[in-house]
């Protein structure tokens, strides 16, 4: 049995010009980067509308919109 801590790598992703360090398995790096890009795109759409201010509110609205797309 392998140790999960040793099976991960740290990946840097950028969302709204902010860098985040995220650990994931090597075979999940591509999906993580695509997910971060998708979240960044959705948050930018909300931010550019000007209707919602504050990074936390933009993030919550993006999360709700993304969840709605999959429900």
Predicted regions and their residues:
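Amphipathic, hydrophobic secondary-structure cores in small proteins
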Residues: 19-21, 27-34, 40-61
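Long, leucine- and charge-enriched amphipathic alpha-helices
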Residues: 63-71
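A positional/architectural concept
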Residues: 1-27, 34
């Amino acid at each position: 049995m392998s140790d999960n801590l040793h099976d991960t790598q740290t990946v840097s992703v950028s969302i709204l010009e902010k860098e985040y360090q995220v650990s994931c398995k090597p075979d999940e790096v591509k999906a993580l980067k695509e997910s971060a890009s998708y979240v960044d795109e959705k948050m930018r759409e909300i931010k550019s509308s000007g209707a919602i201010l504050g990074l936390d509110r933009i993030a919550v609205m993006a999360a709700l919109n993304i969840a709605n797309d999959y429900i």
